[in-house]
Regions:
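GHKL (Bergerat-fold) ATPase N-terminal catalytic module, capturing the glycine-rich phosphate-binding loop
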Residues: 1-179, 183-185, 192, 199, ...
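GHKL/Bergerat-fold ATPase module in large chromosome/replication-associated machines
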Residues: 117, 135-158, 178-182, 188-688
């Protein structure tokens, strides 16, 4: 072919600086684009073979080689695809590929940094100029009689094309890296990039260093493959040892048979898995394969609890695997990773515009070839197709969880402590998910039994509630007909909960003795979750176990008013707090001398203050302080009432107050110091 010198149709000097500006944080995507081009070329060649338009050689290998050369600062991408003729190079490289880059640029020019293009797909071949001063292409088409082509361009407006010397079908792209991009001639850096973007591309990808010393390995001759390069044949004689037999006689025994081995050039190891687990049918995958895939992709050696294999072909193509990771404690941060792929090519992690936000607490991969890529994040948010994908994923997750609860309740309960933060967050964020999961949310009670929300309501409903149900309905209907306005709200069913089983053990024991139940809610998300449930069903309310005294904890007789007045004055004087709230009750549990209560409204307001770092503000501004509840039946309380002028009384009051507070919340460092010192003083008093 005649040598040709040509000009690109558009001034590339204006394009490449802008491309580099937009992709400065993702400039490693050039490798993904060039490897993807090679994979596409291989796929097309294999398709031609299937169609009978080309016959692949018997020794054909579908592969992309990436070769680094740090000394020369070059990087090569070699594929065994269908190659190009001179006319095709002219068409695809200087026209179509360039117009693709131009179209790519047009999508970016009006975008802000807050509205990035998803995945940066479509730049293709011209992404090479992000890192290279000069690019060479050597290619040979599969077409009979085609001549090899050599094409060069320095990123400016002109290119040169002439006949090349490539002898095998395929394409080789050589990048002469610029000074800012020499990192990409480092073998370890390129391995990192390939593993990031191309770990699951549908062809084998090999990475090597040019002019590196040849490495070797030794294998059994039986393991020899046709493509192995034999360096040396090795015969190992049988190994023997002299041993004593049963008769005490020494004899020579063979401990290892003779072996024929071969020394071969070290086999290259593919950096990609052309058949990732998510592309297989779920019925053909074993539990061990799922676990191994999880370890490999997420570098997490704690086994996942369980997983969901997504496999849908209509109305859109979507495959993937979602894993529920094990969380060690309620204090673990829940940081999931959902990797999004397009035709086995990695796009990005955790794209919340495609994947429901609450699912990002899980770990998994989702591959959706139908997903629009060259669009902005804001466009995805309003894309009806993407919304359907999101809804489908949510439905499959809900179906898996509800199905497990119905058919394998034992496993569901076993996993609950780990999966509950995810489910609760999902219910808060997604109303449809909440509706599906409403009957399958579990609460562990103080005896370790798991209850549904319906169970909790039934256990805590007052006996008279059931008898009044029909009357309430009739009364409501009558009032509606009469146009009555000031209706009294029906009494809510209260579900009590515990946030710290150790600290609140005194309250738990009181509840057990009174045959009252409470559920354990100690995760950070539980506060928001119970608020969500209360908004959804306004006939229920949640109260912490120390929020109030229930009727079941009180005795039948009310405390003496005069005694109550005396004790209030004594405690306020002893604690030097004239605003202290004191309530005297006859508690059924005579072992409890004092306890603290704080209304649920005040607690939640204080929790909100902590959440928003509103420290230093007086909690009483937002709903009041704790109330000290004294048990009039307890001997210590009776002693204080009868001996208000004793010198021991102030010390006993202070000690009782701190003991009650310890069962309610942590003391401050200063309060704890005073408590320990006072306790020591009381012990000394006992020795005298």
């Amino acid at each position: 072919m005649a040598e040709k010198h040509g000009s690109l149709s558009i001034n590339s000097e204006n394009i490449f600086p802008i491309i580099k500006k937009w992709l400065y944080s993702d400039h490693d995507i050039f490798a993904r684009e060039l490897i993807s081009n090679g994979c596409d070329a291989i796929t097309k060649l294999k398709k031609l073979d299937v169609m009978g338009e080309y016959t692949l050689p018997d020794d054909y290998k579908a592969e992309v080689q990436v070769i680094v050369n740090p000394e020369e600062k070059t990087l090569k991408f070699i594929d065994t695809g269908l190659g190009m003729t001179a006319d095709e190079v002219e068409e695809y490289i200087t026209q179509i590929a360039f117009s693709g880059a131009t179209e790519f640029l047009s999508k970016y020019k009006d975008k802000t940094t807050d509205d990035q293009i998803i995945g940066h797909f479509g730049l293709g071949f011209y992404s090479a100029f992000m890192v290279a001063d000069e690019v060479h292409i050597d290619t040979l088409s599969y077409k009979e009689g085609a001549a090899p082509v050599h094409w060069t361009c320095d990123g400016g407006t002109e290119y040169d094309m002439q006949e090349g010397n490539k002898t095998t079908v395929g394409t080789e792209i050589t990048l002469f890296l610029n000074d800012e991009s020499t990192e990409f001639s480092n073998e370890y850096r390129m391995r990192e990039i390939i593993e990031k973007y191309c770990s699951f591309m549908p062809v084998n990808i090999y990475l090597s260093k040019e002019n590196a010393p040849q490495e070797y390995e030794t294998i059994d001759e039986a393991e020899l493959r046709d493509d192995d390069v034999i360096v040396e044949r090795i015969h190992e004689d049988a190994k023997t040892e002299e041993k004593e037999n049963d008769k005490g006689e020494k004899e020579v025994v063979e401990v290892s048979p003779a072996k024929d081995k071969v020394k071969i050039n070290k086999r290259p190891v593919s950096l990609s898995d052309p058949e990732p687990l998510w592309m297989k049918h779920p019925n053909s995958c074993t539990d061990e394969e799922y676990k191994e895939f999880y370890r490999k992709v997420f570098m997490d050696y704690k086994e996942p609890l369980f997983w969901i294999h997504l496999n849908m072909d209509y109305p859109f193509n979507l495959k993937g695997i979602l894993y529920f990771p094990k969380i060690n404690t309620e204090y673990d941060s829940i940081e999931g990773t959902i990797k999004l792929y397009n035709n086995q090519v990695f796009i990005a992690d955790n794209i919340k515009e495609v994947i429901p936000e609450f699912l990002l607490l899980l770990k998994g991969v989702i591959d959706c070839p139908d997903l629009p890529l060259n669009v902005s994040r804001s466009a995805l948010q309003n894309d009806g197709f993407v919304k359907k994908i999101s809804e489908y994923i949510t439905k499959k997750v809900a179906d898996k969880l509800t199905g497990m609860c119905k058919t394998d309740r034992e496993s569901y309960e076993k996993y609950w402590d780990d999966i509950s933060p995810f489910i609760k967050y999902g219910c808060i964020k997604d109303s449809k998910f909440s509706d599906k999961m409403n009957d399958y949310i579990l609460f562990k009670n103080i005896d370790g039994k798991y209850l549904t929300l319906k169970d909790c309501i039934e256990e805590n409903r007052k006996p008279e509630d059931e008898t009044k149900t029909e009357e309430t309905v009739e009364s409501t209907e009558e009032k509606k007909e009469d146009g009555a306005k000031d209706e009294k709200e029906p009494e809510k069913t209260t579900i009590f909960y515990v946030t710290d089983e150790v600290q609140q053990s005194q309250y738990i024991n009181m509840f057990r003795e009174a045959k009252k139940d409470a559920v354990i809610l100690k995760h950070n998300i539980d506060s928001a979750f119970i608020s969500h449930l209360e908004q959804k069903d306004q006939t229920i309310q949640f109260k912490r176990i120390d929020a109030d005294l229930t009727e079941e904890l009180r005795g039948e007789e009310a405390a003496d008013e005069e005694t109550s007045k005396t004790l209030t004055e004594v405690f306020r004087d002893a604690l030097k707090n004239d605003k202290l709230e004191v309530k005297v009750e006859n508690l059924k549990n005579e072992k409890v001398a004092a306890m603290m209560t704080l209304s649920e409204e005040s607690r939640r307001m204080q929790d909100m203050m902590k959440m928003y770092n509103m420290y230093g503000m007086d909690p009483s501004m937002f709903g009041g302080q704790e109330t000290l509840v004294l048990n009039a039946k307890h001997p210590l309380v009776q002693f204080i009432a009868d001996n208000k002028d004793s010198e021991k009384t102030p010390v006993i009051c202070e000690e009782l107050y701190d003991l009650a507070m310890l069962s309610h919340k942590q003391l401050s460092p200063e309060e704890m110091t005073r408590f320990v010192q006072r306790s020591n003083e009381i012990l000394l008093m006992l020795t005298k």
